[in-house]
């Protein structure tokens, strides 16, 4: 594992302010990554505070285990299983804040052996947990054109998804796509229009990565389970990096911040009325990175921080 990778956490200051950190509070970092946000929380909480962290990437867990602090604990798991983690630690209904920093980390992107980057040549893997599921190479080889087309279109919003899907399967008739630059070359040849501002492989790599890791389903489950863990007044802060992620977060917060409407005069029992009362969240803010941060950390450009609070 490359320990020299430079990592700058996105909107670190804004995240800490949005979580409204309490000195004796209990917090969960659902996406530890390289620990930038976690370390900021540890610096802010007091002696009685606690920080629990989760990451599906064993390399991130290795980094987390180097933190020798009695207030901190990390496990190797998916953040969709945050409820199980909270049950085990007896903190359901006691958590003051939860954060998710979605997408890939610098640890994954900058390591060519992980296969996430279209700018670095390495094995075409893309798994956030290299010990679970199948690699991108294996999935592309086994999948049919329609499946690949669906993934590229829906998870990458790729304009030339059909052309790229056909090109991939044509190549796979001869051999597997073993490395990232092989896939980049296939995409470049299948893409008729060149955009000097955007790499032609960007959306395809995003789509395959999202599908391989079931990222959107992870987000949905993680958000729903977070509501069962927070204490009243507890906050949920999420940083997303593209429209698919942000749409899920936005819709989730909108869903749980609206009051249910019942047509006037409609007979309804008290029990039924209680099930309709889903107004659990108060939306706190939506924050974008400053121009200064974008200049310092270009990765922050597309990020959005949304925060909501569980109602008292």
Curated annotation (Swiss-Prot):
Binding-site positions, S-adenosyl-L-methionine: 35-37, 55, 79, 101, 108
One GO biological-process annotation of the entry reads: rRNA base methylation
A Pfam family matched by this chain, by name?
Methyltransf_5
Q: Where in the cell is it found?
A: Cytoplasm
Give the SUPFAM superfamilies listed for this entry: Putative methyltransferase TM0872, insert domain, S-adenosyl-L-methionine-dependent methyltransferases
Catalysed reaction(s)?
Answer: cytidine(1402) in 16S rRNA + S-adenosyl-L-methionine = N(4)-methylcytidine(1402) in 16S rRNA + S-adenosyl-L-homocysteine + H(+)
Keywords associated with the record: Cytoplasm, Methyltransferase, rRNA processing, S-adenosyl-L-methionine, Transferase
Q: Name one GO molecular function term.
A: rRNA (cytosine-N4-)-methyltransferase activity
PANTHER family, per database record: 12S RRNA N4-METHYLCYTIDINE METHYLTRANSFERASE, S-ADENOSYL-METHYLTRANSFERASE MRAW
**Stored NCBIfam families:** 16S rRNA (cytosine(1402)-N(4))-methyltransferase RsmH (TIGR00006)
| Family that this chain belongs to | Belongs to the methyltransferase superfamily. RsmH family.
What is this protein identified as? Ribosomal RNA small subunit methyltransferase H
Biological source species: Buchnera aphidicola subsp. Schizaphis graminum (strain Sg)
